[in-house]
Curated annotation (Swiss-Prot):
TM annotation in the entry: none
Modified residues (Asymmetric dimethylarginine): R131, R133, R135
GO cellular component: exon-exon junction complex
Residue positions, PTM Omega-N-methylarginine: R107, R121, R128, R130
Record note on quaternary structure: Probable component of the exon junction complex (EJC); the association is RNA-dependent.
GO molecular function: RNA binding
InterPro entries: DUF4594
Protein name: Coiled-coil domain-containing protein 9
Region (Disordered), start-end ranges: 40-531
Coiled-coil ranges from the UniProt annotation: 149-185
Length: 531
């Protein structure tokens, strides 16, 4: 009984071993199939120049190695169906049953020793018979298993071969499609498979192959190629090209998709329309600019041009303080300002002169104009300068009045006086007007009394005579008045001298070519000037 149990246990062990072997064989076949598919896909990727994990050198050697490895891996799969043969084979399969039989005989002898009554039941023949049956049963089961496994393996091999052929056909179609696409031939999309990768569809890259042999770390599909120097230089050239080109819109749209390009063009048109409307708002109906600082702008500045450097100046032109001073424009502006200031001073100075008493101021202005037309420099110099000191410095002598004389000629003197008047225009304006109004009545009577016997030989202007002040040219009374008489028409009536004599005296005692108004107080010069 123990021998039968041992033989059954041996048969069960053989069956378990067969099952394990079959499971291992199937697992190996599955692994081999997967490995072969991966290797085939890797080969295709290498042919197209997209394989990242493949080594960069010796690709022909690698192909041979892959073929050898695939053959080596196929070897176990071809032998694997015969793995269950040794237990059931007649040639080399006798040793396990014999060993099992010997083990069974040993166990039977031990059982004899334990139970001598069972010895005649177990005999050599019986043991051999069971051993023979043990040999026969594994042989039959092994034959069936081998036939089934062989059939399955053949089916698997056939399917794998068909799959590989299909994959090769699909990859060939994809490669042909990509090749035609590069050459410009349009064909329908190729058949897709589970290993299809859109990054592989540009075919092999000879340049990337060469760069990879040079140990380049960048992939051939990257922007600019494997050479990083070309990437950097390409960026610089692209920027310079965008600056130098007619517009950057064409360059920008090259890297856009169709949808992005359409959106960008629509946005660009809207912005251009808004800009044109804004420019129209800044123009008058006649086409001129509404603002003065826009007069120098041209239509070319508002188009997409290669010179963005000038944009900040026009952008900040709206602010007056940031406007760059241009010499011609700035000079014209100053001349206009001077003209306006002089005309304003003329209007202010002419207000008190409209009355009867202060005829001297208007007379001086008239004489300034007449002398200027006659080109005589002598009477011009003292008339605007000498009365300037009179409102504030009453006791000053006539020779001291022209002491600060201008060294340059008349034109420069006029400019200097104009500048001083602009600087100190409204300092003494109110004071002088008040003094003029207060002393109007005091001046009228003495002026008429003293001017009748006095002589005005040549320096008296015709305008004074036209106003009705009589002058006798035969009676010169200038010498006794020069040292002691006050120089101002605003002095008290007792020591007052007429304006005509005072001007005459100033003309005679002052140098004709010198004309110093710079030393005068700045606020005293304005009422007597015509410029």
């Amino acid at each position: 009984m123990a021998a039968t149990l041992d033989l059954k246990s041996k048969e069960e062990k053989d069956a378990e071993l067969d099952k394990r072997i079959e499971a291992l064989r199937r697992k190996n076949e599955a692994l081999i199939r997967r490995y072969q598919e991966i290797e085939e896909d890797r080969k295709k990727a290498e042919l197209e120049g997209v394989a990242v994990t493949a080594p960069r050198k010796g690709r022909s050697v690698e192909k041979e190695n892959v073929a050898v490895e695939s053959e080596k891996n196929l070897g176990p799969s071809r032998r694997s169906p015969g793995t269950p043969r040794p237990p059931g084979a007649s040639k080399g399969g006798r040793t396990p049953p014999q060993q099992g039989g010997r083990a069974g005989m040993g166990r039977a002898s031990r059982s004899w020793e334990g139970s001598p009554g069972e010895q005649p039941r177990g005999g050599g023949a019986g043991g051999r018979g069971r051993r023979g049956r043990g040999r026969g049963s594994p042989h039959l089961s092994g034959a069936g298993d081998t036939s089934i496994s062989d059939r399955k393996s053949k089916e698997w091999e056939e399917r794998r071969r068909q799959n590989i052929e299909k994959m090769n056909e699909e990859m060939e179609k994809i490669a042909e499609y990509e090749r035609n696409q590069r050459e410009g031939v349009l064909e329908p999309n190729p058949v897709r498979n589970f290993l299809d990768d859109p990054r592989r569809r540009s075919g092999p890259l000879e340049e990337s192959e060469r760069d990879r042999r040079e140990e380049s770390r960048r992939h051939g599909r990257n922007w600019g190629g494997p050479d990083f120097e070309r990437v950097r230089c390409g960026l610089e050239h692209e920027r310079q090209g965008r600056r130098a080109g007619l517009g950057s819109a064409g360059d920008m749209t090259l890297s856009m998709t169709g949808r992005e390009r359409s959106e960008y063009l629509r946005w660009k048109q809207e912005r251009e329309k808004i800009d044109q409307e804004r420019l129209q708002r800044h123009r008058k109906p006649t086409g001129q600019w509404r603002r003065e600082w826009d007069a120098e702008k041209t239509d070319g500045m508002f188009k997409d041009g290669p010179v963005p450097a000038h944009e900040p100046s026009h952008r900040y032109d709206d602010q007056a303080w940031a406007r760059p001073p241009k010499p011609p424009t700035f000079g014209e502006f100053l001349s206009q300002h001077k003209a306006e200031a002089s005309s304003r001073r003329r209007r202010k100075s002419s207000r008190p002169q409209a009355k009867a008493a202060p005829r001297a101021y208007s007379d001086h202005d008239d004489r300034w104009e007449t002398k200027e037309g006659a080109a005589s420099p002598a009477p011009e110099t003292p008339q605007p300068t000498s009365p300037e000191t009179s409102p504030k410095e009453t006791p000053m002598q006539p020779p001291e009045i022209p002491a600060p004389a201008h060294r340059p000629p008349e034109d420069e003197g006029e400019e200097n006086e104009g500048e001083e008047d602009e600087e100190w225009e409204d300092i003494s304006e109110d004071e002088e007007e008040e003094e003029i109004e207060v002393e109007e009545g005091d001046e009228e009577e003495p002026a008429q009394d003293h001017q009748a016997p006095e002589a005005a030989p040549t320096g008296i202007p015709c305008s004074e005579q036209a106003h009705g002040v009589p002058f006798s040219p035969e009676e010169p009374l200038l010498e006794p008045q020069a040292p002691g008489t006050p120089s101002s028409p605003f002095s008290p009536p007792s020591g007052h001298q007429p304006v005509s004599d005072w001007g005459e005296e100033v003309e005679l005692n002052s140098p004709r070519t010198t004309h110093l108004a710079g030393a005068l107080s700045p606020g005293e010069a304005w009422p007597f000037e015509s410029v």
